Amino acid sequence: MYNDYDLVVVYSDYSIVVRGGKVKFIAIIKNSYTLGQVIQQSRLQQGFSQRELAKKLGVSQRWVWEMEQGKQGLLMERLFKVLEKTGVTLSAEFETKDS
């Protein structure tokens, strides 16, 4: 899986892999908090403020903040319960921008 990377660091819920000058973050999403953290890190990496992302999505800045904080709604709660009970692993990844 990681054979073509220069450096791989694996933690319990995420990995950081480096190839050339690019860094890729790969996270296992077990709950809404982890999902929010990945979204936040990706947004920051892309240079967006919460307000800018909200405008792109057509939602309020508060909605983006709540998503990044892992605020659970009924749908999110059910989604993670279904994933847990069915043994499904949800993962997310993003790569740093070119310098």
Which residue ranges define each predicted feature?
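Short basic helix-loop element that most often maps to the first helix and adjoining turn
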Residues: N3, Q37-E52, K56, K81
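DNA major-groove recognition helix of helix-turn-helix/homeodomain DNA-binding modules
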Residues: L75-E93
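Recognition helix of helix-turn-helix/homeodomain-like DNA-binding domains
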Residues: G58-Q72
